[in-house]
Design a protein with these regions (language model features):
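Divalent-metal (often Zn2+) His-rich catalytic cores of metallo-beta-lactamase-fold enzymes
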Residues: 182-215
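Active-site HxH/HxHxD metal-binding segment of metal-dependent hydrolases
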Residues: 41-129
Length: 215
């Protein structure tokens, strides 16, 4: 279902875990974030992108390697993929097997292939900036929940893609380290100081529309 939509931003919400997938339109490109989870949901996102894309390039941002965030990547084979350097070092087969186990348990068939995307743009440090015409994406490493997470800030819209952090519904699961998690949360002040954030989108739960909600 669509959790939120305006002329440039559409937030899709899965029936599972309140997982969000985001499509951002600018005059320069389409940005797709973590398309997931169920086949019909992934197809809805793909069909929406196809309907509005025109001749614009598609950028696929994968915030981290949890299977539920990569399961829909195969629906966008033409996209330029952005992910962290640590994401690239994972064992793809292990992560895809988690998705297969889920699908087998619930008798799920997918029309789009399960694939672990290879990053075309690799985030290795905070502040990496990707400029596409008048659209700019700034990336930050976001370790703690996993060791391969990233934040993305999309400007001039002021959208902060937060991955599995700053959720209003999800317990803060830590699979990397608590020190990493704290360091990632401490980047909140830096991001808010360096960017005018109008909308924060967590990987699970509801979007926040003010700094008061974010903090």
């Amino acid at each position: 279902m669509i959790q939120y939509q305006n002329d440039q931003i559409t937030i899709f919400e899965s029936q599972l875990y309140k997982t969000t997938s985001t499509v951002i339109q600018t005059e320069d490109c389409l940005i797709v974030v973590d398309p997931c989870i169920l086949p019909a949901e992934v197809e809805e996102i793909r069909d929406y992108v196809t309907s509005v894309r025109g001749s614009r390039p598609v950028y696929l941002v994968i915030t981290h390697s949890d299977w539920d965030h990569v399961v829909g990547a195969g629906a966008f084979p033409e996209a330029t993929v952005v992910a962290s350097a640590a994401f690239q070092s994972k064992n793809p087969e292990e992560i895809l097997e988690q998705a297969r186990v889920f699908d087998d348990e619930y008798y799920i068939d997918r029309k789009t292939p399960l694939m672990y995307p290879k990053a075309d743009v690799v985030v290795e440090q905070d502040g990496l900036r990707l400029e596409i015409g008048n659209t700019a994406l700034t990336f930050y490493q976001a370790k703690g929940h996993t060791d391969d997470g990233i934040f993305a800030v999309v400007e001039p819209l002021g959208v902060w893609i937060a991955g599995d952090y700053l959720s209003d519904v999800e317990f803060p699961f830590i699979s990397s380290s608590s020190a990493d998690y704290i360091e990632t949360l401490e980047k909140t002040e830096t991001i808010l100081a360096n960017h005018r954030i109008n909308l924060l989108i967590p990987g699970h739960g509801h979007a926040a529309f003010s700094q008061e909600e974010i903090l």
